Amino acid sequence: MFFRNLTLFRFPTTLDFSQIDTLLPPVQLKPVGPLEMSSRGFISPFGRDEQGVLSHRLEDFLWLTVGGEDKILPGAVVNDLLERKVAEIEEKEGRRPGGKARKRLKDDLIHELLPRAFVKSSRTDAILDLQHGYIAVNSSSRKSGENVMSEIRGALGSFPALPLNAEVAPRAILTGWIAGEPLPEGLSLGEECEMKDPIEGGAVVKCQHQELRGDEIDKHLEAGKQVTKLALVLDDNLSFVLGDDLVIRKLKFLDGALDQLEHSEDDGARAELDARFTLMSAEIRRLFLLLETALKLSKAE
């Protein structure tokens, strides 16, 4: 259940989530209809075993999950059938259908195929820190994160969440760290980075499994390249890649964090899940607060 990526948003800590359990059922995921392309809504964080539980809260952490069902209609299949239909009409009527007629034919084909299309299920998990006013979405896609915000907005009626905004350029901070400026306490460099020439269409350099402080990196910095992605390690607990878009990718929970689970005395699957949720939420909070200070992240009003 550990998150692998984090797209973060901020929201005012004054928001009231006390009625969340009564607000979610009306916006629960419904099966995609025969003539629908997709469906979105909330599902249980615990999966099929507890379908009626649409949220999970431990102290100031709230776990929500947005589920999706999407019809799979490969474009190649639709286009192949469309060309066959167009050929039939051309042979029968002696003329090739124009643009508008082709569009109507394509719409009719999709309408005909939808009830028989396969359905792909998906889920996107999110943790809301009600004390510090941020939401961490388990995705590296901004669009996926915005979709989760939209679903929460639909449930609450209003949810003024905004993407993270840094008061200083993240690229400048990341470049400074790799150039030798002191990192925040507990943070150290990993072995991966991406550097770009700031001019449009400039060169891009990607380094992996490499010492990030050395002559080779220095030459790129001297040439004016700036760091756009940087691998970092937080104590012995987390490793991740931070981008200048403020998205956290390749998040991994290390032994320093996982060892805490081995000392848990709780038994049972639900107790183990709660222990993992508590650990993950606390580590993400620690990381967020560190980055909030280092990058001067704006608060939500």
From Swiss-Prot:
GO terms for biological process: DNA recombination; regulation of DNA recombination. The keyword Iron-sulfur does not apply. It is found in: Cytoplasm, Nucleoid. The keyword Cytoplasm applies. InterPro entries: RdgC. Keywords: Cytoplasm, DNA recombination. Its main location: cytoplasm. One of its GO terms (molecular function) is double-stranded DNA binding. Belongs to the RdgC family. NCBIfam families: PRK00321.1-5, PRK00321.1-6. May be involved in recombination. This is Recombination-associated protein RdgC. It comes from Xanthomonas oryzae pv. oryzae (strain MAFF 311018). The lineage of its organism: Bacteria, Pseudomonadati, Pseudomonadota, Gammaproteobacteria, Lysobacterales. The gene is rdgC.
